[in-house]
Swiss-Prot record:
Name of the encoding gene: banf1-a
Single biological process term from Gene Ontology: negative regulation of protein ADP-ribosylation
Recorded family membership: Belongs to the BAF family.
Protein name: Barrier-to-autointegration factor A
Pfam families membership: SAM_BAF (PF02961)
Alphabetized InterPro entries for the sequence: BAF (IPR051387), BAF_prot (IPR004122), BAF_sf (IPR036617)
Subcellular location: Nucleus; Chromosome; Nucleus envelope; Cytoplasm
Length: 90
């Protein structure tokens, strides 16, 4: 099993609330700005897309690549973060 970042652990440790999209694991400043420009300014907005895609890993990673040019590691980290958050809070 791969280890998770501190950012990932911090995110999944509590309810999402109004956290910025940049609080998601795998999403740094550059990707965060690209997502914000497309209207995905909060983590919960990205969660909405994750749920619309029925938590499908490949569809979500492809969407993230298309919308903000996320690479494989970034999209995998973001997917894992949202999946673990959903497992804990939904």
């Amino acid at each position: 099993m791969s280890s998770t970042s501190q950012k990932h652990r911090d995110f999944v440790a509590e309810p999402m609330g109004e956290k910025s999209v940049q609080c998601l694991a795998g999403i740094g400043e550059a990707l965060g700005h690209r997502l914000e420009e497309k209207g995905f300014d909060k983590a919960y907005v990205v969660l909405g897309q994750f749920l619309v895609l029925k938590k499908d890993e490949e569809l979500f990673k492809e969407w993230l690549k298309d919308i903000c040019s996320a690479n494989a590691k970034q999209s995998r980290d973001c997917y894992g973060c949202l999946k673990e958050w959903c497992d804990a809070f939904l």
